[in-house]
Amino acid sequence: MKIKVSNANTPNWKEVTVKSHIPEELKKLEEMARNIWWAWNYEATDLFRDLDPVTWKEVGQNPVALLERLSYEKLEALTQDKVIVKRMNDVYAKFKAYVDAKPDSKRPSVAYFCMEYGLTHVLKIYSGGLGILAGDYLKEASDSNVDMCGVGFLYRYGYFSQSLSMDGQQIANYESQNFGSLPIERVMDENGQPMVVDVPYLNYFVHAYVWKVNVGRVPLSVSYTHLRAHETSAHL
């Protein structure tokens, strides 16, 4: 007897990203949320907080997650709030004047490589003092308008949150990051597909997706190696 194996029940996995619809009148908020410039500019963080203070706290002060969480009705109501709209336009004008300034071409260009960057608690790609220092370097380079780019890694499980056990011992809680709700954007190739870079290592290649973090004027490229094609040892 010959038995044929059917693939009818084999799942066909596809990645789908669902985003909330931001009214055209509030698109400036979305653009600013995707640049970590807000992390060291209090006018911007205060603006996002005042959109909905309760939700702002619930999403951990993450502007991207905040805009995704707000209901359509809430967003429509904000378009009619003249105070919020004026504040948004004022902050956006400062933001655009800042990011559109051209770097001094007389100074050397800099490529900065680091394993971790402490830019904001929202983006957990750091673990200690080295990362915080590297993050400050990028922010200062942005404020000084240095022609710099950063290179690093994107981690699914970044820095942990701490809690205490009943006997007073520290517990490290590692939470998986939802990349779709972070101030990062995936880099696409010329065919509109996620860019993959191949890095030779020992006797095989490590494949990595590339994501971009806008740190004010400084672009930070981070690679992510957690691909299905890899053995577990190649995952970050």
Regions found by a protein language model. Give the residues of each.
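Flexible loop/turn segments at secondary-structure boundaries
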Residues: 117-122, 155-161, 228
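Conserved small/polar residues in nucleotide/adenosyl-binding loops
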Residues: 225-232
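Extended, charge-enriched "interface" segments that sit outside catalytic cores
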Residues: 2-101
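Glycine-rich, histidine-containing beta strand-loop boundary motifs that form or position
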Residues: 114, 150-154, 224
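Extended, Lys/Arg-enriched charged tracts that mediate electrostatic binding to polyanionic substrates
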Residues: 167-211
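A conserved hydrophobic secondary-structure block that centers on an alpha-helix together
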Residues: 120, 124-147, 151
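Hydrophobic or amphipathic alpha-helical targeting/insertion segments
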Residues: 142-160, 164, 171-174
